[in-house]
């Protein structure tokens, strides 16, 4: 059994760790609020550009490379979104597991998987396992901004536009010598953690390219008239320039904004996961201190009882010795 001094040392150590986890919990909580605010701030633009694309969908042929499913595709890019820091519970483990499942499905479908990773934890994971990574970007998982994620967005769009038969230009972050072109791909998938609530975050797969245009949760047909929720035909719009030209200009913007929204949502999910992990660690530390304190008190009581017993026994022995004299 541990001595009282050892127990007190453990209590001090656990309390010290508890202060750290509590501080991390509070920091993560404040970051969740900020991240949620950024997601909400980006929503109006995303909704408006989606609305414009819906209008264009009814007036254009939709014959655009970013919308076209390529027959006989050979290569598929997978972007795995992880965190730069740890202490986030199962956040990184879950998204890496989801990515492995996706890569297996793509390989079984005949695609060569081209892996890209954001976040230091994901980079370290694949490096430790000696698995190939075509490009890595770090330093913005908790606080993504438009400029920091520029090379990620542009490379994925350029690579898809080039297709597996063409080549995309080198960009910073790719694991190739500067200036060397990289072979393109026919699909782009993003594996990230979806923020549902403070307590729930789920790893999901989103097909970024080719774009799957959706109107009121239904895949629209080429040239289909838009109907309002009441079943009435929506007004006919005139576009200047023509709808196909506008679609050509807006689709890259839409894809860029969608990917940036994914980074923002992943940042919120990371902070929420870290907050939950740190809260659980703080609660466990509190319970452990209670248990250790109870054991220490019991040991102290036993020690005091033993000392009293020894004193009483000694006094009795002295008394008996005096009487015999």
Curated annotation (Swiss-Prot):
One of its GO terms (biological process) is proton motive force-driven plasma membrane ATP synthesis. Gene3D superfamilies: 3.40.1380.10, ATP synthase, gamma subunit, helix hairpin domain. Its main location: membrane. GO terms for cellular component: plasma membrane; proton-transporting ATP synthase complex. The keyword Cell membrane applies. Keywords: ATP synthesis, Cell membrane, CF(1), Hydrogen ion transport, Ion transport, Membrane, Transport. It is a peripheral membrane protein. GO terms for molecular function: ATP binding; proton-transporting ATP synthase activity, rotational mechanism. It is found in: Cell membrane. NCBIfam families: ATPsyn_F1gamma, PRK05621.1-2. F-type ATPases have 2 components, CF(1) - the catalytic core - and CF(0) - the membrane proton channel. CF(1) has five subunits: alpha(3), beta(3), gamma(1), delta(1), epsilon(1). CF(0) has three main subunits: a, b and c. Produces ATP from ADP in the presence of a proton gradient across the membrane. The gamma chain is believed to be important in regulating ATPase activity and the flow of protons through the CF(0) complex. Belongs to the ATPase gamma chain family. This is ATP synthase gamma chain. The gene is atpG.
């Amino acid at each position: 059994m541990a001595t009282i001094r050892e127990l007190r040392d453990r209590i001090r150590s656990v309390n010290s760790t508890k202060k750290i986890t509590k501080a991390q919990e509070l920091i993560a909580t404040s970051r969740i609020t900020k991240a949620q605010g950024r997601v909400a701030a980006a929503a109006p633009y995303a909704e408006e550009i989606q609305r414009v694309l819906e209008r264009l969908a009814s007036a254009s042929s939709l014959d655009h490379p970013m919308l076209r499913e390529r027959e006989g595709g050979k290569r598929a890019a997978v972007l795995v979104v992880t965190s730069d820091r740890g202490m986030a519970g199962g956040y990184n483990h879950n998204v890496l597991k989801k990515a492995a499942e996706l890569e297996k499905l793509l390989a079984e479908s005949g695609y060569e998987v081209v892996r890209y990773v954001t976040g230091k934890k994901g980079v370290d994971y694949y490096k430790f396992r000696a698995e190939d990574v075509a490009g890595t970007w770090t330093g913005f998982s908790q606080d993504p901004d438009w400029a920091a994620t520029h090379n990620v967005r542009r490379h994925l769009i350029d690579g898809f536009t080039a297709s597996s038969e063409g080549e995309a230009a080198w960009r910073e972050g790719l694991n190739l010598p500067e200036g060397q072109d990289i072979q393109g791909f026919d699909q782009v998938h993003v594996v990230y953690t979806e923020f549902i609530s403070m307590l729930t975050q789920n790893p999901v797969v989103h097909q970024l390219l080719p774009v799957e245009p959706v109107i009121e949760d239904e895949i629209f047909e080429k040239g289909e008239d838009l109907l309002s929720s009441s079943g009435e035909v929506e007004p006919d719009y005139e576009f200047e320039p023509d709808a196909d030209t506008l679609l050509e200009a807006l689709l890259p913007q839409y894809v860029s904004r969608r990917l940036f929204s994914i980074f923002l949502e992943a940042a919120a999910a990371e902070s929420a996961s870290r907050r939950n992990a740190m809260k659980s660690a703080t609660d466990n530390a509190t319970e452990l201190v209670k248990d250790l304190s109870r054991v220490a008190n019991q040991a102290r009581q036993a020690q005091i009882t033993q000392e009293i017993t020894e004193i009483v026994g000694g006094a009795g022995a002295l008394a008996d010795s005096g009487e015999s004299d």
